[in-house]
C-alpha cells in the first residue's frame, strides 16, 4: 500500500500583511486599495469573507495579504 503524502498548506509567513483604505470598488469583487505606505494595490475578497457575506465599501479600512511574487495584487482578509 503506498504511503499517503501529507498535504502542504500555504504557510501564512509566505505572504506580507499590510493595511490600507479601499478607494474604489471594481467589477467581480475587486477593489483598488491605497496602502498606508502610499502604494495602490488591486485586491480581491478572501473566501471566508465571501461565505459570510461581509460587505466592503469605499472608505473601509482593510487588512491585506500580499504575495511576495506579485506585489501589485493582494487578498483582503479582514475589514476594520
From Swiss-Prot:
S1-like domain location: 6-80
Keyword Transmembrane: no
InterPro entries in the record: NA-bd_OB-fold, RNA-binding_domain_S1_IF1, TIF_IF1
Superkingdom of origin organism: Bacteria
CDD domains: S1_IF1
Protein location: Cytoplasm
SUBUNIT field: Component of the 30S ribosomal translation pre-initiation complex which assembles on the 30S ribosome in the order IF-2 and IF-3, IF-1 and N-formylmethionyl-tRNA(fMet); mRNA recruitment can occur at any time during PIC assembly.
Similarity remark: Belongs to the IF-1 family.
Record protein name field: Translation initiation factor IF-1
Species: Deinococcus radiodurans (strain ATCC 13939 / DSM 20539 / JCM 16871 / CCUG 27074 / LMG 4051 / NBRC 15346 / NCIMB 9279 / VKM B-1422 / R1)
Organismal lineage: Bacteria, Thermotogati, Deinococcota, Deinococci, Deinococcales
Amino acid at each position: 500500500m503506498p504511503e499517503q503524502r501529507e498535504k502542504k498548506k500555504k504557510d501564512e509567513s509566505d505572504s506580507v500583511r499590510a493595511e490600507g483604505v479601499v478607494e474604489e470598488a471594481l467589477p467581480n469583487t475587486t477593489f483598488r486599495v491605497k496602502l498606508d505606505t502610499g502604494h495602490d494595490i488591486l485586491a480581491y475578497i478572501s473566501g471566508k469573507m465571501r461565505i459570510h457575506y461581509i460587505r466592503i465599501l469605499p472608505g473601509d479600512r482593510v487588512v491585506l495579504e500580499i504575495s511576495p511574487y506579485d506585489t501589485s495584487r493582494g487578498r483582503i482578509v479582514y475589514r476594520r
